[in-house]
Design a protein with these regions (language model features):
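Active-site-proximal loop/hinge segments that shape catalytic or ion-binding/gating pockets
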Residues: 1-6, 11, 20, 25-64, ...
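Short hydrophobic beta-strand that contains or immediately precedes a catalytic carboxylate
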Residues: 72-75
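Catalytic metal-binding/acid-base residues of hydrolase active sites
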Residues: 78
Length: 248
């Protein structure tokens, strides 16, 4: 089992793609520093995320720059080849084992203001809670908060991408990160496979408008085009993540 940080490499950031920004900085940065998130969008002073962190960490980060705040990931308790929290991205960073020592964990997600929160010695308890929760598998991750910088050259074991990115600018940028690059089995599905009750029939209709067979590459193209509501594209991703996993 490992600690993973999920992300969408080809979604927009700073006029390019997320993976390009990562390659420029050599770091996986906090949502307070990047201004983007694949979850809630309240990472600003006085926002919900700011208040959650203030409570969880007893004010430790209240006055620090965004770049010094923790980054969020998940304990990949099932050794899932897709990562520990696929709700938040088609690709992921797999961290070196020693990073666990400077991480904290909780269940459920911190958006729910959990009381079960602590260091790595609490992981067996948190994993048992997650296993028994009955939550959808996009929602049952054991959340991790990594304290201190995450540098690709020293703290990361590998970046794991969807195979649709092989031979693309996404892979080229990933190979500039200074860590290994791997590929998981892949996400792909026809919108006809999506249950309209999962995220709504309007989301299935949007998915159909994007193509007959969807991949993370296609969704990233749609996200960068800026034609559709980003929150709706995010929900199409939830459907692809839920119904589009495949085995080798």
């Amino acid at each position: 089992m490992t600690l993973t940080l999920q992300f969408h490499p080809n979604w927009p950031h700073e006029g390019g793609m997320v993976i390009e920004s990562m390659a420029k900085t050599g770091m996986y940065r906090s949502q307070f520093a990047t201004g983007i998130s694949n979850g809630g969008l309240t990472a600003f002073v006085g926002g919900d995320r700011w208040h959650w962190e203030s409570r969880l960490f007893a004010g430790r980060y209240d006055g620090v720059p965004g770049a010094e705040r923790p980054v969020y990931g998940a304990w990949n308790r099932r050794a899932d080849p897709y990562g520990g929290a696929i709700r938040f991205g088609s690709s992921y960073v797999r961290l070196r084992a020693e990073v666990v020592e400077r991480s904290t964990f909780c269940f459920p997600d911190s958006v729910h203001e959990p009381t079960d929160f602590g260091a790595a010695d609490l992981l067996p308890h948190l994993c048992a809670l997650a296993d028994g929760s009955g939550f959808d598998d996009l929602d049952d991750c054991v959340e991790a908060q990594v304290h201190g910088p995450v540098r690709f050259g020293t703290d990361v074991e590998a970046v794991v991408l969807d195979p649709c990115f092989q031979g693309t600018e996404v892979e080229a940028s990933a190979r500039r990160l200074g860590c290994a690059v791997e590929f998981h089995p892949g996400f792909t599905a026809s919108p006809s496979a999506f249950d309209p009750d999962y995220r709504g029939s309007h989301i299935v209709e949007l998915a159909r408008s994007l193509g007959d067979e969807l991949t993370p590459g296609i969704l990233g193209d749609a996200a960068r085009a800026g034609v559709h509501d980003p929150q709706s594209i995010k929900k199409v991703w939830h459907c692809l993540a839920r119904f589009g996993r495949r085995t080798r």
